[in-house]
Amino acid sequence: MHRMGTWYGIDSYVASLNAKAWQDRKAHVEAMISQAYKYMGKPWLTGCSSSPAYGVNYSGLVMQGLYAGGISPVPTSSIGHAHPGNEWNSRNLGADKHLKRVAYSQRRRGDLVFYYQLGTHTIWHVAIYLGHNRVIESWPPCVMVAPISNSQHNVIAGIKRPFI
C-alpha cells in the first residue's frame, strides 16, 4: 500500500486516464501534455516515475503522460521503473514497436522525441514535443519546457507518435 509522504511506493503511482477511448487524437495528446505540465518545476529524480507531489526523471514523465493519455507502455512500467536495469526506460520506449516512427520534419504536438547520448548511438533521453520546436522534459534540476535541441540534448535519435 502506498503511504503518502514517504518513499514507500513512490514508483507505484500511475496517472489517471484523462481521455476516453472514443475521443480523437487531440484529446489523448492534450491529456498526456496536461499530465506532464502537472510536474512543471518539480525536481528531476533519477529512476523515478512518481506522482506530481515528488518529481520524475525523463522517461518517468513520459510514462505518466502516456498513462493519462490512455497508453500503458508495457513492458515499460512505472512500477518496474525503479528496479535495477530499468533506469534507461527511454531506450525501451524508443524500441517499442507499438509507437509509430515518424520523420523529424513530420513531428507534431504529442510526439515523443528521443535523443542519443553524445558521441554514441545509444538512446539516453526522451521528451514530449509541444510544437514550435519546444519540448517538456525532466532534466536536472527539474521538469521544464525547453527548445527541442539545446546544449544538453542536441543529437535527436528519432520521433515516435504514440497517438495516431
Where is each model-derived feature located?
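Intrinsically disordered, low-complexity
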Residues: 1-45, 105, 153-164
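Secreted/periplasmic proteins that engage bacterial cell-wall peptidoglycan
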Residues: 26-96
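...with weaker cross-activation on analogous glycine-rich loops/strands in unrelated enzymes
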Residues: 71-145, 149, 164
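Extracytoplasmic/periplasmic, Sec-exported soluble proteins
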Residues: 24-28, 50-57, 99-105, 119-122, ...
